[in-house]
């Protein structure tokens, strides 16, 4: 839903919510970690693997805005790093670092529905996009800047709905 200064999505206000707010909403289902992909700076993320939002279930992905200094300190103190792909590692945070990480503001919320969506379902739920961009292979990016939503519509894979504050849409 659209708010005066941003949007409210999955019960959280963007901008304004922190990872602690996500933890309050999702409890121990929320898993916080740093993700480091080769050639890119690490990012602070949190996931809920089995989230139900109304009639649809799927995976929630929260992106937080941690400073490069905090990310480096947390990585230096990390409990462990484990590979999630050839180029990406998940970095577990120590308790004191996780407590600090929970205070970081959310900048984006993603949702990967467990069921396949199609163009008709997107139009029914969100209306006509302001713009449709062609991506790689069979992926289209449906842009809804007024509501802070970008959807990656994948003819062969899972869709990704990404929410940011409308004021941050172009930047993110």
Where are these regions (language model features)?
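A cross-family detector of function-defining hotspots
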Residues: 19-172
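Short, recurring structural edge motifs at helix starts
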Residues: 6-12, 108-111
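N-terminal functional modules and adjacent low-complexity/disordered segments of proteins
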Residues: 4-7, 43
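Glycine-centered tight-turn and secondary-structure capping sites
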Residues: 15-16
């Amino acid at each position: 839903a659209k708010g005066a200064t941003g949007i409210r999505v999955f019960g959280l206000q963007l901008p304004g919510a922190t990872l602690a707010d996500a933890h309050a909403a999702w409890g121990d289902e929320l898993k916080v970690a740093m993700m480091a992909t080769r050639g890119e700076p690490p990012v602070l993320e949190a996931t809920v693997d089995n989230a139900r939002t109304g009639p649809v279930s799927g995976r929630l992905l929260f992106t937080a805005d941690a400073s490069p200094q905090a990310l480096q300190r947390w990585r230096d103190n990390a409990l462990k790093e484990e590979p999630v792909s050839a180029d990406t590692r998940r970095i577990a945070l120590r308790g004191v670092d996780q407590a600090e990480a929970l205070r970081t503001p959310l900048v984006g919320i993603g949702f990967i529905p467990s069921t396949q969506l199609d163009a008709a379902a997107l139009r029914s739920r969100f209306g006509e996009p302001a713009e449709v961009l062609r991506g790689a292979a069979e992926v289209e990016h449906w842009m809804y800047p007024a509501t802070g939503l970008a959807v990656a519509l994948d003819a062969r894979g899972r869709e990704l709905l990404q929410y940011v504050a409308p004021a941050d849409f172009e930047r993110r």
